[in-house]
């Protein structure tokens, strides 16, 4: 944050931070405009009846999700311009990887920006999505793995995928996942990508191998 304030630009700030840390690769913000994630959460009221309430802010949305299920997500402002650097990176990429991460607060927000969504649909890069290991977290209660793809398609109907990586043990609805992936133009690569110590966490090495194999086959 100090570098951003000193240089007056988040892209320059992140580049300086990367140089200081001698980091490989580059982190780019999708917009120079501060964005707020908001959403609708369906939960039971004091009388037991279901109601939908609007929540603003990523932390508030995550907390509210403990009490119900996220049914919609949005960005404010909705017309924030994307950074040219991010759009150029998408255009020039060989592969674009989506996930893993919280569906509504980590994966979908990028697709809510029209310019980014259009760039992802238009790029000549191949597209890969890593499905989450768990489907029953607070954000996605009641959603199966196939539903994650269905939600993604509902927000970005023009987005095509080439490969979906799914954990061989975590996914129980294989046929449904394959059907949803096929609707987006993708094949499913089933692989053991969870940690041997904690099956709810991705193993970095296993996931790296699975991604490498998906990209080379």
Which residues does each PLM region occupy?
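N-terminal glycine-/serine-/threonine-rich phosphate-binding loop
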Residues: 47-93, 110-114, 122, 193-217
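Glycine-rich nucleotide phosphate-binding loop and flanking beta-alpha elements
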Residues: 97, 103-104, 171-172
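Structural motif
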Residues: 97-99, 128-130, 165
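C-terminal functional extensions of proteins
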Residues: 142-217
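Glycine-rich beta-alpha junction loops
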Residues: 33-35, 43, 134-135, 168-170, ...
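Glycine-rich phosphate/diphosphate-binding loops and the adjacent beta-loop-alpha structural elements
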Residues: 1-9, 101-108, 134-138, 194-196
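Conserved phosphate- and dinucleotide-binding cores of soluble alpha/beta proteins
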Residues: 60-67, 76-83, 89-91, 103-160, ...
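Electropositive, gly/pro-rich neighborhoods at or near active sites that engage anionic ligands
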Residues: 1-68, 212, 216
């Amino acid at each position: 944050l100090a570098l951003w304030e000193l240089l007056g630009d988040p892209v320059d700030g992140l580049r300086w931070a990367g140089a200081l840390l001698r980091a490989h690769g580059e982190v780019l913000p999708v917009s120079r405009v501060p964005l707020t994630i908001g959403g609708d959460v369906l939960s039971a009221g004091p009388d037991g009846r279901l109601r939908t309430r609007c929540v603003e802010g990523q932390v508030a949305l995550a907390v509210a999700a403990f009490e119900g299920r996220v049914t919609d997500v949005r960005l404010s402002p909705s017309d924030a311009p994307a950074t040219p650097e991010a759009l150029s990176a998408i255009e020039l990429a060989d592969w674009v990887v989506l996930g893993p991460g919280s569906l509504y607060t980590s994966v979908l927000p990028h697709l809510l920006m029209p310019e980014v969504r259009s760039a992802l649909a238009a790029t000549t890069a191949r597209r890969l999505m890593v499905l989450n290991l768990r489907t029953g977290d607070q954000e996605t209660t009641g959603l199966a793995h196939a539903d994650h793809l269905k939600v993604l398609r509902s927000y970005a109907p023009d987005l095509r995928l080439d490969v979906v990586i799914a954990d061989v043990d975590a996914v129980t609805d294989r046929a449904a996942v394959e059907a949803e992936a096929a609707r987006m133009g993708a094949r499913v690569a089933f692989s053991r990508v969870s940690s041997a110590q904690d099956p709810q966490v991705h193993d970095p090495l296993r996931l790296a191998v699975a991604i490498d194999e998906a990209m080379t086959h």
